[in-house]
């Protein structure tokens, strides 16, 4: 087993005004097989590595193996000092911190939150409710209108700012439409409890069917409408139903009083 650290130079030093950057490549070789720490953590790699709870030290080796796309058996063959060094590098690359919102990613543009379709809104809400980390590829694909196979290769830093931004924006939408989402007793969107994912999907399916007037053939038409237009109607419709229920209850109570 051998550990190799390579400092790579990007750019052309023969030109005085050229842009030159450096990056460190860390790799090790076991049985003629070389494994490298990637220059950046891709969206796909992040989704696979985030499942390891790093509070448990037993998960450090599989975490590093995931980052380096190496078998766990290779981790077991590393000297403790080498493993500790590689682990530190991987953890450093995995730290995201506060990232700016990128308007472009791999040739695709970030969608406008205020003009997204109802379909995009529903899909984002569903995936975020199920967990950002577990659905980061799907969320990023919607945000940038990119195919999954494209966006999963993007550096996680390039899309993380937009993911956090849409999550905060979603919370504001919930507060704005608290009558529809029934947030009177809650502070904002909640993580789904056991069976909650199915409830969220059912809630949106019922909402879509209400917009389509229970006509399956109209579903595509209504989900392509602006999200705000859809929520405005759904909020009004819900208020009308509640008003009707109150009127029916009042009529029932009046009838009971008259028959006594």
What residue spans do the PLM features occupy?
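An amphipathic, hydrophobic-aromatic interaction surface with interspersed Lys/Arg
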Residues: 2-256, 260
């Amino acid at each position: 087993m051998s550990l190799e650290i390579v400092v790579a130079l990007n750019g052309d030093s023969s030109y005085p005004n050229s842009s030159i950057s450096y990056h460190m490549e860390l790799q090790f070789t076991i049985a003629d097989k070389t494994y490298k720490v990637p220059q950046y953590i891709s969206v796909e790699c992040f989704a696979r590595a985030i499942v390891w709870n790093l509070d448990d030290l037993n998960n450090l080796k599989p975490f590093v193996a995931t980052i380096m796309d190496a078998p766990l058996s290779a981790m077991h063959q590393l000297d403790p000092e080498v493993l500790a060094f590689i682990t530190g590098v991987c953890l450093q690359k995995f730290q995201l911190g506060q990232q700016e919102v990128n308007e472009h990613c791999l040739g695709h543009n970030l969608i406008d939150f205020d003009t997204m379709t109802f379909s995009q809104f529903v899909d984002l809400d569903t995936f975020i409710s199920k967990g950002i980390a577990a659905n980061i590829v799907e969320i990023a694909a919607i945000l940038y209108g990119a195919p999954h196979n494209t966006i999963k290769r993007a550096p996680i830093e390039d899309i993380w700012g937009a993911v956090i931004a849409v999550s905060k924006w979603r919370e504001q939408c919930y507060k704005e439409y608290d009558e529809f989402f029934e947030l009177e007793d809650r502070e904002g969107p909640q993580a789904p409890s056991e069976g909650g994912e199915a409830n969220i999907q059912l809630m949106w399916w019922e909402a879509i069917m209400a917009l389509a007037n229970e006509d399956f053939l109209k579903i595509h038409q209504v989900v392509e409408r602006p999200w705000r237009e859809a929520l405005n109607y759904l909020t009004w419709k819900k208020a009308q139903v509640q008003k009707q229920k109150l009127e029916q209850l009042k009529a029932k109570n009046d009838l009971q009083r008259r028959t006594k």
